[in-house]
UniProtKB/Swiss-Prot annotation:
Quaternary structure, from the entry: Component of the RNA polymerase I (Pol I), RNA polymerase II (Pol II) and RNA polymerase III (Pol III) complexes consisting of at least 14, 12 and 17 subunits, respectively.
Name of the featured protein: DNA-directed RNA polymerases I, II, and III subunit RPABC1
Gene: RPB5
Localization: Nucleus
GO BP: termination of RNA polymerase I transcription; termination of RNA polymerase III transcription; transcription elongation by RNA polymerase I; transcription elongation by RNA polymerase II; transcription initiation at RNA polymerase I promoter; transcription initiation at RNA polymerase II promoter; transcription initiation at RNA polymerase III promoter; tRNA transcription by RNA polymerase III
PANTHER family on file: DNA-DIRECTED RNA POLYMERASES I, II, AND III SUBUNIT RPABC1 (PTHR10535:SF0)
Role noted for this protein: DNA-dependent RNA polymerase catalyzes the transcription of DNA into RNA using the four ribonucleoside triphosphates as substrates. Common component of RNA polymerases I, II and III which synthesize ribosomal RNA precursors, mRNA precursors and many functional non-coding RNAs, and small RNAs, such as 5S rRNA and tRNAs, respectively. Pol II is the central component of the basal RNA polymerase II transcription machinery. Pols are composed of mobile elements that move relative to each other.
PROSITE patterns documented for this protein: RNA_POL_H_23KD
Molecular functions per Gene Ontology: DNA binding; DNA-directed RNA polymerase activity; RNA-directed RNA polymerase activity
Keyword vocabulary terms for this entry: Nucleus, Transcription
Length: 214
């Protein structure tokens, strides 16, 4: 029973992080969704035997009007939590088909333990859509809420252009952030996109730096 309760609690926290992550990317998520209590989560997600049904945690999200003004190419997004501990080809193929047939621009696949190498090879086949994978355990805590993680803000194309022109820079002269960077993954950064990083300074209050995703 304790193990089940612990699993449900961790799943609830991961679900909250995913909702926050999707909202921080510019999608419409209500505060009520993020603030869902553990008791309400349990009543919605668990069956009569108190076993969590991850398929009930899947959801679609659409960009806000404000986000579309800044990022016109931002399309709808689908998040899926997988009930299987180890993800094989069949499950990943079904996920890829769902993303393609429903014309989602992004699919976020949350797995429990592992994805087989063969299943991973299917991910690029949904292009131009993109699929991102996250392990449940990596989402229990929202890394962007940590005191030592500075605020990262993705720039629009015109903001990036203005930045390069203002400082007379080429893209190759900007410091880099890898797509595998934890915050880069959280924001879903793609190659060529630039983030503004705001840090606190004891002398100047706050200062901004910029990094380009490679």
């Amino acid at each position: 029973m304790e193990d089940t309760d612990r699993t449900i609690s961790r799943l609830w926290r991961s679900f909250k992080t995913v909702k926050e992550m999707v909202r921080d990317r510019g999608y419409y998520i209500t505060q009520e969704e993020i603030d869902m209590s553990l008791a309400e989560f349990r009543s919605r997600i668990c069956d009569s035997m108190n076993v969590p049904q991850r398929k009930l945690m899947c959801f679609q999200a659409n960009p806000t009007a404000e986000s579309l003004e800044k990022f016109p190419d931002l399309g709808s997004l689908w998040v899926e939590f997988c009930d299987e501990a180890s993800v094989g080809i069949k499950t990943m193929r079904n996920f890829c088909i769902h993303i393609s047939e429903k014309n989602f621009s992004t699919g976020i696949f949350i797995y429990q333990s592992s994805i087989t190498p063969s299943a991973n090879k299917l991910i690029p086949t949904v292009s131009p859509a993109s699929i991102e994978t996250f392990q449940e355990g990596d989402l229990v805590v929202n890394i962007t809420h940590h005191d030592l993680v500075p605020k990262h803000i993705k720039l629009a194309r015109d903001e990036k252009k203005e930045l390069l022109e203002r400082y007379r820079l080429k893209e190759s002269q900007l410091p880099r952030i890898q797509r595998e960077d934890p915050v880069g993954r959280y924001l879903g950064l793609k190659r060529g996109e630039v983030v503004k990083i705001i840090r606190r300074s004891e002398t100047s209050g706050r200062y901004a730096s910029y990094r380009i995703c490679l």
